Every structure is written in C-alpha cells, then in structure tokens.
From Swiss-Prot:
UniProt keywords, alphabetically: Cell inner membrane, Cell membrane, Membrane, Mercuric resistance, Mercury, Metal-binding, Plasmid, Transmembrane, Transmembrane helix, Transport
Name this polypeptide is given: Mercuric transport protein MerT
GO cellular component terms listed in the entry, alphabetical order: plasma membrane
InterPro entries (UniProt xref): Transprt_MerT
Family to which this protein belongs: Belongs to the MerT family.
Organism: Shewanella putrefaciens
Membrane-related topology note: Multi-pass membrane protein
Localization annotation: Cell inner membrane
One Pfam family, short name: MerT
Amino acid sequence: MSKSNPNFPIIGGVIAAIGAGLCCAGPFVLLLLGVSGSWIGNLTLLEPYRPIFILLVLALFGFAGWKVYRPVEDCEPGTSCAVPQVRKRRQVIFWLTALTALVLVTSNYWIVWFA
C-alpha cells in the first residue's frame, strides 16, 4: 500500500489559492513583470469559478491543519509526524503557505489600492 504525501493538502491549497487569485492578482502581477497584451483581460473569465477555488482552499488547508496539529499519539512510531523537529518545520510551512493563500484569496479586495 502506498503512503500518501503529507504535503499534498498544503500544495493543493496553494494551487487552489493561485486559481482563486488568478482573476484579480494575475493581470496585476503580469503587468508588474512587464507582460502586456489584450489577452490579459481573459483571465477575468475565471471569476465565476472563484468561490469553488476558495472552498477548495478552505477544505485543503483544514485537512492540512488537522494533519499537522494532530496529537503525537495518533502518529505511528517511527513516522515523520512523531519527530518534534519535523512537526515544528511542518507547522511553520503550514502557516507560511496559509498566509500566502490568504493573500491570494483576498486579492480581489486589496488589489484595487495598488492598481
């Protein structure tokens, strides 16, 4: 039986957050990088799917938080979640990526101040 990747929920959450922020922050970031063209306006076509991406972000980060902060007693002996240094590193990575996802998901509201 194959072991699941413990980082999958975090990686999936960040990818979903990128999808949620692509319609709003995407054109702004591309313009900051010097990329231009009329096709950039097509990124707003993803706006109707934004709530789905946001729900996906919440679900994946909720699952990741549950996996990262579950009690040590629930971990099998010898696995990485039972090692204190690995647990601490995963918690830091979880919060850094959650903050990144929050910035991307809320970009629809704050990007207007910079554009």
